[in-house]
């Protein structure tokens, strides 16, 4: 079983790298969806990475925009509650879409929304490879408690654990400085509540702990 899981994770790593700049991934950017002020330095740091990961209803810089969010999206983490933005399906055939399914541990049906493109080609990420070990790092029990990390934290944890020798650039995560918030504000689209299944103060602490080893940068 262990060998099967290792092979599955290795295959996903190779697949993800094929959507970036090359097989040798030495830098990864993971961008969440909080509203950001323009920053040419941050946008350049994101777009200069070997692999750029986005989350759910993400936003990209368009032609003529002040550099803020960056313009690349190689891998997209998302869930069935997706609120698609104008950028999500634009050029979707050139991206790897990774569908996280923590709710399948309890109540979520194994169905695909009819409004998604039939050729989206999403890869379903095994909970044994992502949800459960990440929850363990957070001190949560997803199987017994019905609690799990946000999709954004899943994306960042996956990037960090899948490419352990790469530098990690993280931007767009409001809970790093606002761990007690109860609503999400988004770079595009309406705000919404923080789901009751999340414990974002624990996620905030996890992100801040990553900075200590010197290979993770959290951009304001």
Q: Which role does the model predict for each range below?
A:
Residues 1-220:
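Metal-ion/cofactor- or nucleotide/acyl-coenzyme-handling active-site neighborhoods
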């Amino acid at each position: 079983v262990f060998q099967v899981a290792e092979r599955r994770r290795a295959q996903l790593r190779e697949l993800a790298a094929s959507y970036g700049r090359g097989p040798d991934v030495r830098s990864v950017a993971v961008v969440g969806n909080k509203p950001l002020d323009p920053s040419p330095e941050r946008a350049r740091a994101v777009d200069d990475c070997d692999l750029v990961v986005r989350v759910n209803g993400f936003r990209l810089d368009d032609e003529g925009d002040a550099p803020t969010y960056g313009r690349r999206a190689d891998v997209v983490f998302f869930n069935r509650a997706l609120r698609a933005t104008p950028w999500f399906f634009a050029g979707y055939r050139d991206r790897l879409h990774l569908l996280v399914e923590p709710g399948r541990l309890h109540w979520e049906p194994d169905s695909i929304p009819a409004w998604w493109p039939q050729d989206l080609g999403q890869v379903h990420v095994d909970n044994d490879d992502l949800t459960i070990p990440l929850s363990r790092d957070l001190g949560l029990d997803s199987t017994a408690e019905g609690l799990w990390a946000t999709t954004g934290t899943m994306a960042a944890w996956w990037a960090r654990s899948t490419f352990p020798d790469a530098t990690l650039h993280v931007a767009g995560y409001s809970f790093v400085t606002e761990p007690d918030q109860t609503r999400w504000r988004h770079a595009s689209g309406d705000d919404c509540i923080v789901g009751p299944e999340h414990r974002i103060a624990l996620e905030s602490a996890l992100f801040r702990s990553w900075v200590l080893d010197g290979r993770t940068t959290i951009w304001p």
